[in-house]
């Protein structure tokens, strides 16, 4: 069964973007390449259990096992040593990526308190979009009673778009609720 968002991309977004930006080929139309979800757990320096809990939550949210990230260099001010595990990340591609994006746009973002749309200024100049989420409770897989601490995460949506305008139109076509 094809994903709902992927079908929308094929049937609606590609023709709309081709018409707006006059692409010569269907292959020139921007698409979502991957989604990277990163959860930095600073308190993992003192307590390794918090990182395990965060990684388990990230696995529930994304549907795949996260990669544990380690500190690249020592920083005395943060009492951090090189090689210490301080976070977890997941890279989603293909079917899982579309499923996550669909869930993010239609279920999770509307559950954010006082939500007025995601900021339009979070593009990086190359059509990629970065979104910060303050709490993991917006995802339906997370059980409120099992949460020991509210943790945020960074969600980076990497597209093949060359400009921010193309990336914005692609994500808007896929249903991303940008602030007016």
From Swiss-Prot:
Keyword rRNA-binding: yes
Disulphide connectivity of cysteines: none
Gene: rplE
Recorded family membership: Belongs to the universal ribosomal protein uL5 family.
UniProt KW RNA-binding keyword: yes
Function: This is one of the proteins that bind and probably mediate the attachment of the 5S RNA into the large ribosomal subunit, where it forms part of the central protuberance. In the 70S ribosome it contacts protein S13 of the 30S subunit (bridge B1b), connecting the 2 subunits; this bridge is implicated in subunit movement. Contacts the P site tRNA; the 5S rRNA and some of its associated proteins might help stabilize positioning of ribosome-bound tRNAs.
InterPro entries registered for this protein in UniProt: Ribosomal_uL5, Ribosomal_uL5_bac-type, Ribosomal_uL5_C, Ribosomal_uL5_CS, Ribosomal_uL5_dom_sf, Ribosomal_uL5_N
Name of the protein this chain belongs to: Large ribosomal subunit protein uL5
GO molecular function annotation: rRNA binding; structural constituent of ribosome; tRNA binding
Segment forming the signal sequence: none
GO cellular component: ribonucleoprotein complex; ribosome
Keywords on record: Ribonucleoprotein, Ribosomal protein, RNA-binding, rRNA-binding, tRNA-binding
GO terms, biological process: translation
Top-level division of the source organism's lineage: Bacteria
């Amino acid at each position: 069964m094809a994903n709902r968002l992927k079908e929308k991309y094929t049937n609606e977004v590609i023709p709309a973007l081709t018409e707006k930006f006059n692409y010569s080929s269907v292959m020139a139309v921007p698409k979502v390449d991957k989604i990277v979800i990163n959860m930095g757990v600073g308190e993992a320096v003192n307590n390794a259990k918090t990182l395990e809990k965060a990684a388990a939550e990230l696995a529930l949210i994304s549907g795949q096992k996260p990669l544990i990230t380690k500190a690249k260099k020592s920083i005395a001010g943060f009492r951090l040593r090189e090689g210490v595990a301080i976070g977890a990340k997941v890279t989603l591609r293909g079917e899982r990526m579309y499923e996550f994006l669909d869930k993010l746009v239609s279920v999770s973002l509307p559950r954010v308190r006082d939500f007025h749309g995601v900021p339009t200024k979070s593009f990086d100049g190359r059509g990629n979009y970065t979104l910060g989420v303050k709490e993991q409770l917006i995802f339906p897989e997370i059980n409120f009673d099992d949460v020991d601490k509210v943790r945020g995460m960074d969600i980076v949506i990497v597209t093949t778009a060359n400009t921010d305008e193309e990336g914005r139109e692609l994500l808007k076509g896929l249903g991303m609720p940008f602030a007016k």
